[in-house]
Regions:
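Lipid interaction determinants
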Residues: 6, 15-85, 89-152
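Repetitive helical segments and hydrophobic/amphipathic motifs
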Residues: 11-12
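Bacterial N-terminal signal peptides that target proteins for export
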Residues: 1-5
Length: 152
């Protein structure tokens, strides 16, 4: 009886060790609704800015990130230099980020002002797989990739 109990406990321990974190691709493919990607406050990394790759656009110190939490109507992240937060409103395919505040570190050469100006416009968004596109007047102005949390 003791051996059976020990065997069952060992099996239970092994089953409980299974990783619950999926890749960003699994996260994206498991979503029932595009807006659910915002409900869970997933982190997005900037991959292009105004038609240029993020690093070519001047984000050489740190890759900017964006987190949108629809449940709390909040946005936040990092501009490539400073951490920021603000209010986020998602209506249909429209995203508005407003009342942005940030830390005030100095970082030479980072196009942070332009990043904040673009982010604070009312933008249309689309999500294609793991890529979030923010557009203004039909032009893609920023693209973000769903950050793979398991890679850290």
């Amino acid at each position: 009886m003791k051996k059976l109990f020990v065997a069952l406990m060992a099996v239970a321990a092994l089953v409980s060790c299974k990783s619950t974190q999926g890749t960003s691709q699994e996260k994206a493919s498991n979503k029932q609704n595009i807006s659910e990607l915002f409900v869970e406050a997933n982190q997005w990394e900037l991959i292009s800015f105004n038609g240029q790759a993020a690093k070519e656009a001047g984000f050489t110190l740190k890759t900017p990130t964006l987190v949108i939490n629809m449940a709390e109507n909040k946005a936040g992240g990092n501009s490539g230099c400073n951490s920021f937060g603000g209010e986020a409103i998602v209506e249909g395919s429209t995203l508005t980020i407003d009342k942005v505040f940030s830390t005030k570190m100095y970082c030479d050469g980072v196009p942070e002002i332009e990043f904040f100006q673009m982010l604070q416009q009312t933008l249309n968004y689309t999500i294609k797989g793991e890529v979030l596109q923010l557009t203004k007047d039909g032009q893609v102005i920023m693209e973000f990739k769903l950050k793979d949390e398991s890679a850290e």
